[in-house]
């Protein structure tokens, strides 16, 4: 993905949303790339016996989508000086369409503060984050 030219944001501005689909193939690719081969993510028989009832995406895969949205919004400012405090709220599952969005809550002392979240198509919050980016 090519980062767009950074734009100036003010408190209350919405960040450009991003949508991604979670598939078992994407989860498996993430497992290979990250080295995280927990059977909860890749073994459907095992995962069916857990509280989740099936495989789920790695939480960090969901946060990667959030980071992709922030890169699109802030470009190099996010990549070189951004900070995120995230909370996982619900699992992402194969077949989910994840929409990532956020808004600027405050601009103070050269820092943009944002709230962001990832939701599935049912509107359930999968992850939320407080974000700081150099203005």
Where are each of the predicted segments found?
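HotDog/MaoC-like acyl-thioester-processing domains
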Residues: 1-15, 88, 92-135
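Catalytic strand-loop segment that frames the active site of acyl-thioester-processing enzymes
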Residues: 1-55
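A generic structural signal for short beta-strands and their flanking turns/coil linkers
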Residues: 11, 18, 26, 36, ...
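Short, intrinsically disordered, mixed-charge
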Residues: 32-36, 71-75, 121
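Hydrophobic beta-strand-centered segment that forms part of the acyl-chain substrate-binding groove
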Residues: 48-57, 61-104, 112-113
